A protein has these predicted regions:
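Residue signature of alpha-solenoid helical repeat architecture, marking inter-repeat boundaries
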Residues: 23, 62-63
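The tetratricopeptide repeat
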Residues: 66-67, 102
Length: 112
C-alpha cells in the first residue's frame, strides 16, 4: 500500500513538473531552417505555417508573436503582396506592440 502511494505521489509530482511553453510555435524552427537551407521546400514551409495558424485560429488561440508577420513576409517574397498585407494586418491586430512596424510595411506595400 505504501509503495503504491509513493508511486502515485511520484507520478503526480513528475506530471506537475512538465512545462508548457507560453506560445505554440508549431514546427516553426525546423521549417525556418528548411526554408533557408532547402530552397525547394519553400512552398511546403509556407503551407505548414499557414496550416498551423489556421489550427490556432480554430482553437481560438492567439498565435505566437511574429508568426503572422512571418507568413506575410513569406508571401511577399513569393510575389503576393495582397496576402502579405492581410497577414501584416492580422499581426497588428493580434499584437498591438507590432502596429507601428506593420503599419509602415502596409503603407509601403500599398503605395507600390
Amino acid at each position: 500500500m505504501r509503495a503504491s502511494l509513493s508511486i502515485l505521489l511520484l507520478a503526480g509530482l513528475l506530471s506537475g513538473c512538465a512545462t508548457q511553453g507560453l506560445y505554440d510555435w508549431g514546427d516553426y524552427e525546423a521549417d525556418l531552417f528548411d526554408y533557408y537551407h532547402q530552397p525547394g521546400d519553400k512552398e511546403r514551409v509556407i503551407e505548414n505555417l499557414v496550416q498551423h495558424l489556421d489550427r490556432m485560429a480554430a482553437k481560438g488561440r492567439k498565435p505566437a508573436p511574429g508568426l503572422l508577420a512571418e507568413a506575410g513576409t513569406y508571401y511577399l517574397l513569393e510575389g503576393d503582396a495582397e496576402a502579405a498585407v492581410d497577414f501584416y494586418r492580422q499581426e497588428a491586430a493580434a499584437w498591438p506592440e507590432s502596429r507601428p512596424m506593420m503599419a509602415t510595411l502596409i503603407t509601403n506595400l500599398e503605395a507600390n
